[in-house]
């Protein structure tokens, strides 16, 4: 079984994080369940570190002026034209702000994947929006894009 950090994150999100419960899940129980499900300890630890860093980031504030994003060479190598276009689409349609886009890019780069797929990008956007207070509307809109078929978008 060749699982990576992203697979662990998706498992956690679908089974624990996206629930309407008041009580937070026990991290030790989650780790045990992940091990029993066959995920490697190293990837579990990396996923928890990824989530901890996401949770430690300050709540996002919308920029007062529109911003033009220039991607670094490392970002260009990991995020193909389709991914960059989708980020722009989300920002232009009010799902992401310039600030939330930066958090998404930071979390994508932290995955240590050679290339980020559009599917992985969508899930990371969903996780970032879920983690931020007062982003319920954007989260709901993004959730529809992840869970439902989505017609093509303009590049």
Swiss-Prot record:
Domain of life: Bacteria
Protein family (similarity comment): Belongs to the Smg family.
Name of the molecule in the record: Protein Smg homolog
Source organism (scientific name): Methylococcus capsulatus (strain ATCC 33009 / NCIMB 11132 / Bath)
Gene: smg
